[in-house]
Amino acid sequence: MELLDPKLDVVFKLLFAAPNNRHLLTSLLTAVLQPPSPIKSVTVLNPELPKDWASDRGVRLDVLVELHDGTRVDVEMECEPRRSKGSRWLYHWARLFGGTLKRGDDYAKLESVVCIVFLDAQTEASRFHAHYRVREEHDHSLLSEALSIHVIELPRVTQAMAEHESADLERWARFLRLEDPRELDSLASESPIMAQAKDALELLSLEPSAQRLAEVRREAEFARRLDRAEDRAEGRA
């Protein structure tokens, strides 16, 4: 069986936004966030693919989740760093954060928003799991708990142990990167949730509709890379 690539954003969304895979999504979020108490429930706020996603190569195929305590978590898979990536991530966080406040509400009603980016590339950062907050320059006091952006660079997964990351996050990174399909069998033997993730990916890979969606997205990504290469060659990027 040819498995769909979980690094492809449409496959990532189909896998983790599916109602019958809430346990996988909860496990993934727990591995990244390491909350002080268990995540009791997750509600996917955007389970459907955006309109015109196939024709618009710039559309984001993220998974927006609301936790039991009202915290919103946005999870995104990126196969390569975009230009102005930091500004892009911050802008997207700001839009989500502002969207939690209704007209006339007090600022105290703003809900925390966490953005999680799984990136299949290395940036200038040196860590496998980078966590960005807003802190005072001298005493490093935290300005607000509300701003939190996690970036997990999948190629740096071998650094996970040295960074004292959880075994669960290391396993999820290996699952998402999936350089060798045989790695799934190894992961499945290490953890029951990984065995369930393996089964879910195999089932998704058998669906003709998922195969078609993945092919459309691959073609769009290929066309986008060609456009960027042409821009660079002509000095526009």
Positions of PLM-derived features:
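Elongated, amphipathic alpha-helical interaction scaffolds
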Residues: 1-237
